[in-house]
């Protein structure tokens, strides 16, 4: 049986009641790891249980070359909203940094490889495109770029959120502009590629500073991967990492968009052409392309924009129908859901209206996990959220939080 990180029986940690009052029935909280659900260069992710509720715990080895978890915590708290999993706790022990957050469903790569032809339909891909663009618009408006857009980093929600897409893994994310002046970082050559070469933009592969356009271009490659089940630069013989990046760059440059989009709806070709031609500082026209993919489904293919994907099961549909009826009863508004398409299309507007702006002390309040036994652990200057995000060097300045041993 595989050894897995766990909480010592004699130890645990306290947590702030403001994080999640429902879980704070006792002052002393312990999580029990159940199984590994993910792994990467950063470390491992486990499904965990506490008080009959399930969470995800990300473990980052303290001896790893890069420590990305602190960056991820600060950015996720700043971005918290409809598309970002909620953080429950952050701490460390002798060997690991640990992040506890909402348990999500499968990622899009996992869902893709389980399909019959290892492809998604036009409808499913368009539904995903609409949500991906919405998510990027949300984080870009908050001055953040992700820099590692790929199928593995988009996950579906569980239970009542099983039609919604979430973005994860913000360890490589950064500010692309000042939140005060909106001035973007200089367009300069970097030392190496940041992100995943298969989906990275041409500019990123050329090791240039990234901006909003690079996240969107990566979405374009992800969409073609969903529709075709592969990309022209997959499966090449590679000698080294440097050789791989060079070969992928050459292949991307040498493959025309027309060839890439052969036999696909024009909307996908138009999107990639647009993202490739964006200027470094140019603001993308997110809503135009969201509407294009919406219309592709509802007008050209005459289908409902209902968030029913290729992988959606009958059981999930029954749960959604039950929730839908409950919402009707709760709202007591016969006209509110008269047209399903209108309701779906306006989901984002409703969410945005209900969203709370991030307050300056949110990061401090949400992540002040204090002690083991009776000892305060490693209390090192928690910066207020506002101050963190006003600092253009967020990635270089490590954000230390009040942590606790698990």
Specify the residue positions occupied by each region the protein language model found.
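Juxta-kinase regulatory segment immediately upstream of eukaryotic protein kinase catalytic domains
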Residues: 2-26, 34
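Protein kinase glycine-rich loop
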Residues: 34-40, 45
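ATP-binding glycine-rich loop module of kinase domains
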Residues: 49-70
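Structural motif at the C-terminus of the N-lobe alphaC helix and the adjacent alphaC-beta4 loop
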Residues: 74-82
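Short beta-strand micro-motifs within the conserved protein kinase catalytic domain, predominantly
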Residues: 86-97
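Structural motif in protein kinase domains
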Residues: 104-114
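Activation segment signature within eukaryotic-like protein kinase domains
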Residues: 128-129
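Catalytic-loop of the protein kinase fold
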Residues: 140-158
């Amino acid at each position: 049986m595989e050894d897995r990180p766990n909480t010592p029986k004699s130890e645990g940690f306290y947590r702030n009641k403001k994080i999640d009052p429902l879980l704070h029935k006792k002052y002393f909280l312990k999580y029990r790891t159940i199984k590994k659900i993910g792994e990467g260069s950063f470390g491992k992710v486990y499904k965990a249980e506490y008080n009959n509720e399930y969470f995800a715990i990300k473990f980052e080895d303290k001896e790893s070359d890069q420590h990305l978890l602190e960056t991820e915590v600060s950015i996720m708290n700043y971005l918290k909203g409809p598309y970002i999993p909620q953080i429950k706790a952050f701490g460390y022990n002798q060997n690991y940094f640990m992040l506890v957050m909402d348990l999500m469903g499968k990622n899009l790569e996992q869902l893709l490889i389980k399909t019959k032809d290892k492809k998604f339909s036009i409808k499913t891909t368009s539904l995903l495109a609409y949500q991906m663009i919405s998510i990027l618009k949300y984080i870009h408006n908050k001055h953040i770029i992700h820099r590692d857009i790929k199928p593995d980093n988009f996950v579906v929600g569980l239970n009542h959120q099983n039609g919604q897409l979430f973005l994860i893994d913000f360890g490589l994310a950064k500010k692309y502009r000042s939140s005060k002046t909106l001035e973007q970082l200089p367009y300069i050559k970097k030392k190496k590629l940041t992100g995943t070469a298969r989906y990275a933009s041409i500019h990123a592969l050329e090791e240039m500073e990234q901006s909003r356009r690079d996240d969107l271009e990566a979405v374009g490659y992800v969409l073609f991967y969903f529709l075709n089940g592969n990309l022209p630069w997959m499966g090449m013989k590679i000698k080294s990492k440097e050789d791989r990046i060079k070969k992928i760059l050459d292949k991307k440059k040498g493959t025309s968009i027309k060839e890439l989009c052969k036999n696909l709806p024009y909307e996908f070709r138009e999107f990639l052409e647009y993202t490739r031609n964006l200027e470094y500082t140019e603001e993308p026209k997110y809503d135009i392309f969201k509407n294009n993919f919406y219309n592709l489904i509802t007008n050209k293919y005459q289908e409902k924009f209902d968030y029913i994907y290729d992988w959606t099961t009958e059981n999930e549909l029954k749960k959604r129908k039950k929730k839908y009826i409950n919402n009707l009863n709760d709202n007591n508004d016969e006209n509110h859901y008269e047209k399903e398409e209108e309701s779906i299309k306006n989901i984002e507007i409703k969410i945005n209206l209900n969203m709370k702006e991030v307050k300056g002390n949110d990061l401090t309040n949400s992540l002040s996990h204090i002690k083991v036994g009776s000892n305060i652990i490693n209390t090192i200057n928690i910066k207020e959220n506002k101050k963190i995000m006003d600092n253009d060097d967020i990635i270089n300045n490590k954000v230390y939080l009040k942590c606790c041993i698990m």
